[in-house]
Regions:
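Non-catalytic, mostly N-terminal accessory regions of nucleic-acid modification and defense proteins
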Residues: 26, 32, 40, 45-264, ...
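Hydrophobic alpha-helical scaffolding
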Residues: 218, 272, 307-311, 344, ...
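Cationic, low-complexity basic patches in intrinsically disordered or flexible, solvent-exposed regions
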Residues: 2, 18-22
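Conserved Class I SAM-dependent methyltransferase catalytic core
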Residues: 89, 315, 377-448
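Arg/Gly-rich low-complexity intrinsically disordered repeat tracts
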Residues: 9-12, 17-19, 30-34, 38-41
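C-terminal, active-site-flanking charged/polar segments
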Residues: 425-426, 435-438, 443-481
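Conserved S-adenosyl-L-methionine
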Residues: 243-356, 361-363, 368, 375-377, ...
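Conserved nucleotide-binding/hydrolysis micro-motifs of P-loop NTPases
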Residues: 312, 338-339, 359-362, 403-406, ...
Length: 553
């Protein structure tokens, strides 16, 4: 026997370690509740630790290690959604899973806070009224922890309750909240546009039963759930053109983070955050630093990551993705960040780091374009202006953008390249291969720059994984390892070279990828991109003619 200190989420227990207690054998498992702290033996080959109403883990006495539990649950949920008439796409699957997951998570969060308050002799005020809490309407339990199907609604009764009572009630929190960064506001925002698409109350009952099997309490559980959820987002991203708006391949994000190297205490933003992949991966990167203090961990939770997202579904996915990665109340705002005039951005809004992959080929209305000094309908170009503006002096950025930005000859492209080179040190350009973004149909580059000093030299790296990328053969971390290594010293190689600022044409500011080792890279643009540039040039010509006619009157 030996003395041991065992930690559950936000709780601890000092006790004596039983002789049978195996080492490193945690395996996420079903809930077990008890009123008294202590060890508890169960029949057969398993042992369980019970800690005052706190979910721990099944312990496998054989010491074989923990095994994934939730993968099959996610498959079961998708199987039910597949036969549901109201859900026809991968986007529907993720959307419907997300709002139910959020309510399950919210219930666990509130239960944890209530337990903490009780242990401190305080009373916790629940956010949700009792009849709208998960453990009342969705998963009422009997004493053994199983769902009480005598109390749990199903069929038309369940569907009508969700559609006519639950969702309107949750939507109402947006008006009651004290501010946009509160959990109450986020509840209202999520349910202001997200609707229940599950038409069969029996299917809804089955999905709820599966969702209730999932737990968010331990780091192992959150880790597994975050990976499963990311897999769903990836499938959605592979589903077609629209799905690609939500997913940036994670190996590319991780490589970008390794180049920019965000630090504890810095503010990180993504104002086109999609599923919050950049913010989640940045959190993982920074959280895994050794020796973080409690204060630093609190800073990571509350004062580090900020995002904005225009689309309702992406907003919900971003919130849920950050929660599963371990950020309890994400600082994500549901808004079109381009609607803010750049002149209105205050110093206290500026940040140290920007990561982003703004939408390809989007078109913004004239009134939105008025918010920017370089006016263009190209959404990505407006975002790039915003990213430069919101950075502090010395701030760093990693931005994904279409490779045609480097060479387009329209006025907006030329002016924006000039602005970037003069106001920032564009030190690195990563040229990504075709297929990096499935379904997007365009080639991309990643721009790495630091605000405050003009560009002196640009280092290029031409990424070539040596194979055709596709859905079953995507970009991986190993493909990017050489880029990350060489970028530290901006070394020349058959795939990398440097361009002095003095060699950049001062009239076009052309930054095209031209590898001196392999000749100039010919960029074959899609017909759609060519037509878009023709339309842009035509619009510029029409504007000039309009002004000339005005002068002749």
């Amino acid at each position: 026997m030996q003395e041991v200190f065992l930690v559950a989420p936000r709780h601890g227990l000092t006790g004596v370690k039983p002789e049978w207690w195996p080492q490193n054998s945690y395996r996420p498992g079903p809930a077990y509740w008890a009123t008294t702290p202590g060890y508890h033996s169960t029949p057969a080959h398993t042992r369980m630790l019970v800690l005052r109403k706190i979910l721990l883990r099944w312990i496998d006495a054989s010491g074989l290690g923990w095994k994934p539990m939730f993968e099959q649950t996610f498959k079961n949920i998708d199987d039910v959604l597949w036969k549901e008439a109201g859900c026809t796409t991968e986007l529907d699957y993720v959307e419907q899973t997300s709002w139910l997951l959020f309510l399950k998570y919210l219930d666990g969060l509130e239960q944890d806070k209530a337990d903490e308050a009780t242990m401190e002799g305080k009373k916790y005020e629940f956010i949700l009224q009792k009849q709208y809490r998960w453990d009342v309407w969705a998963a009422p339990k009997v004493k053994d922890g199983k769902i009480d199907h005598n109390k749990a609604q199903t069929g038309d009764d369940l569907r009508d309750f969700v559609n006519n009572k639950l969702i309107p009630y949750l939507h109402g929190f947006k008006q009651k909240a004290s501010g946009p960064n509160t959990l109450e506001y986020k509840i209202g925002e999520i349910f202001s546009e997200i609707k229940n698409k599950i038409q069969s109350g029996y299917n809804l009952r089955e999905i709820i039963d599966h969702i209730d099997e999932l737990e968010f309490r331990s780091q192992n559980q959150k880790h597994e759930l975050s990976h499963l959820y990311e897999a769903k987002i990836k499938n959605m991203g592979n589903a077609g053109r629209n799905g690609g708006e939500y997913y940036t391949c994670r190996p590319l994000i991780r490589a970008m983070i390794q180049v920019v190297q965000p630090k504890i205490g810095e503010r990180i933003r993504d104002d086109a955050c999609g599923s919050a992949g950049f913010l989640c991966e940045s959190f993982d990167y920074m959280r895994n630093k050794k020796g973080l203090t409690t204060k630093e961990l609190k800073t990571l939770q509350e004062k580090t990551f900020y995002g904005q997202e225009k689309k309702s579904l992406a907003y919900v996915i971003a919130i849920m993705n950050m929660i599963l990665h371990g950020i309890e109340v994400p600082n994500i705002v549901h808004a079109n960040s381009l609607s803010e005039n750049l002149a209105d951005i205050q110093d206290n809004e500026r940040c140290d780091v920007v990561f982003a992959n703004p939408p390809f080929g989007g078109k913004e209305r004239k009134e939105v374009q008025q918010n920017f000094p370089i006016r263009t309908g190209e959404t990505a170009y407006l975002f790039l202006q915003r990213f430069i503006k919101v950075l502090k002096a010395g701030g760093r950025a990693g931005i994904v953008i279409k490779n045609t930005f480097l060479s387009n000859t329209d006025n907006a492209s030329v002016s924006l390249r000039k602005h970037l080179l003069e106001s920032c040190n564009l030190h690195t350009v990563l040229d990504c291969p075709s297929g990096t973004f499935l379904g997007a149909g365009v080639k991309t580059v990643v721009l790495f720059f630091e605000k405050g000093t003009p560009t002196r030299k640009v280092w290029y790296y031409q990424l070539d994984p040596g194979r055709n990328l596709g859905k079953t053969n995507p970009l991986n971390d190993e493909d990017l390892a050489e880029f990350v290594k060489l970028q530290k010293t901006v070394a020349d190689s058959p795939k990398s070279w440097s361009l002095d600022a003095k060699d950049i044409d001062p009239t076009t500011f052309d930054l095209s990828v031209k590898n001196p080792s392999g000749g100039e890279v010919v960029v074959h643009r899609s017909p759609q991109e060519i037509m878009e540039e023709i339309a842009t040039l035509d619009a510029e010509s029409a504007e000039v003619l309009k002004r000339i006619k005005g002068l002749l009157k």
